């Protein structure tokens, strides 16, 4: 029961409305981000609004870099 309450609290603080507002992610990108960067209960319970927002922004920068690397064409490193 305690674990369920903790998960609800994390979901309450780390929610799609807040993440969308800060990151401008939508749809599949938003869903993937929310799963990949979901914070722990310990972090969320100790973080104030500013710290949580900064966490989300920092993670969004990492996520955007990951997306760019995935979308970048594979470069051939051998010269002809």
Please state what every model-predicted region is.
Residues 1-80:
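Short beta-strand and adjacent turn/loop elements
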């Amino acid at each position: 029961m305690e674990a369920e309450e903790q998960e609800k609290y994390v979901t309450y603080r780390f929610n799609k409305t807040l993440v969308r507002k800060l990151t401008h992610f939508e749809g599949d990108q938003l869903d993937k981000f929310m799963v990949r960067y979901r914070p722990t209960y310990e972090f969320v319970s100790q973080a104030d609004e500013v710290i949580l927002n900064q966490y989300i922004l920092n993670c969004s920068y990492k996520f955007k870099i990951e997306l760019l690397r995935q979308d970048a064409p594979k470069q051939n490193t051998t010269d002809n």
